[in-house]
């Protein structure tokens, strides 16, 4: 008997469009001889719809206007437990932060990817740092800025950043993905502008020292005994791998494997698995590192619990390089969700 799988996409986060592209890619690659599919789209207004039309219309956003294939029973499918597994392809807030995971837990339907707690901690860059400090995972130096404190103590906070980190620094909303709202500052003027920009997306901001580093990504898969694929390297077309470089600039390159020694490839895989376990991840995550260009010292950058699944995304590409094609990867993720739920 075929498993019934709900593919959730869209949502109210700033990564709505990326989610649509990822979902379309999953729908094109999933083995329909094994699964009955229930694509469920969530609009930017928070409306839920089942959509049975083409993946192309999901990708380009036309699905919302396609009344023939759209029905308003998206929530009912989940709440009535009409599916066996939920595969959330929703990046960022409300999809990757434990919200959808908690909803699935509440209604008793297995969900692909990490648990509520793991998802919420990994989504919050500041709390990820707090947890991994306990496990002695090397990370870039940082300062946390709260919006309400910045309004009343701006000068003191700016001086703290300058004294502790110097320039250049990266300014990041704590709860945001796909590099949305991230800027790089080389001086005080750019720092102030970057903080204002980041506060459009979150009230808690992470300011990190800008390392002279390469960006290395490791795909991890599994529950109690996770495995890591061969690491890949991002060569951004711009100064850093921002939203435009990730999704709109074809000049950015993905190198598989990363240009590291065999010893360091194994080392970074082992650290990625250590991070995965420390954060109690399950199902999947992409663990991102910064590797110093001079010393090859490895610094944890962030953990993505629902990594991109587009045709150009690193997570499926890394597993394909390891011999696990896209369709088989989806199969394994669904099985991991079901087995964790039955454990």
UniProtKB/Swiss-Prot annotation:
Pfam families: Dala_Dala_lig_C, Dala_Dala_lig_N
Pathway the protein takes part in: Cell wall biogenesis; peptidoglycan biosynthesis
Binding site for Mg(2+) 2: 302, 304
Enzyme Commission (EC) number: 6.3.2.4
CC annotations in GO: cytosol
Location(s), subcellular: Cytoplasm
Protein known as: D-alanine--D-alanine ligase
């Amino acid at each position: 008997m075929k498993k019934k799988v709900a593919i959730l996409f869209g949502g109210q986060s700033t990564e709505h469009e990326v989610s649509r592209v990822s979902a379309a890619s999953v729908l094109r690659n999933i083995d329909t001889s094994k699964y009955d599919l229930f694509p469920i789209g969530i609009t930017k207004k928070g409306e839920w719809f089942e959509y049975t039309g083409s993946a192309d219309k999901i990708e380009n956003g036309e699905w919302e206007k396609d009344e023939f294939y759209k029905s308003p029973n998206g929530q009912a499918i989940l709440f009535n437990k009409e599916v066996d597994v939920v595969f959330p392809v929703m990046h960022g807030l409300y999809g990757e932060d434990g919200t959808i995971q908690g909803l699935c837990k509440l209604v008793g339907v297995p969900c692909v990817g990490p648990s509520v707690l793991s998802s919420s901690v990994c989504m919050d860059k500041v709390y990820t740092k707090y947890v991994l400090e306990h496990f002695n995972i090397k990370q870039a130096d940082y300062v946390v800025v709260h919006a309400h404190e910045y309004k009343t103590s701006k000068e003191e906070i700016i001086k703290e950043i300058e004294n502790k980190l110097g320039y250049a620094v990266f300014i990041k909303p704590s709860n945001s993905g796909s590099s949305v709202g991230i800027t790089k500052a080389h001086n005080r003027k750019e720092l102030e502008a970057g903080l204002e920009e980041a506060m459009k997306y979150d009230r808690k901001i992470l300011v990190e020292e800008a390392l002279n580093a390469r960006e290395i990504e490791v795909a991890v898969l599994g529950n109690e005994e996770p495995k890591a694929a061969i690491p890949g390297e991002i060569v951004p077309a711009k100064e850093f791998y921002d939203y435009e470089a990730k999704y709109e600039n074809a000049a950015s390159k993905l190198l598989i494997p990363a240009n590291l020694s065999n010893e360091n490839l194994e080392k970074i895989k082992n650290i990625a698995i250590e991070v995965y376990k420390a954060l109690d991840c399950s199902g999947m995550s992409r663990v991102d590192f910064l590797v110093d260009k001079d010393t090859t010292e490895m610094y944890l950058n962030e953990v993505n619990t629902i990594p991109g699944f587009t045709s150009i995304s690193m997570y499926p590409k890394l597993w394909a390089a390891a011999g696990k094609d896209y369709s088989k990867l989806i199969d394994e993720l669904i099985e991991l969700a079901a087995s964790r739920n039955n454990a």
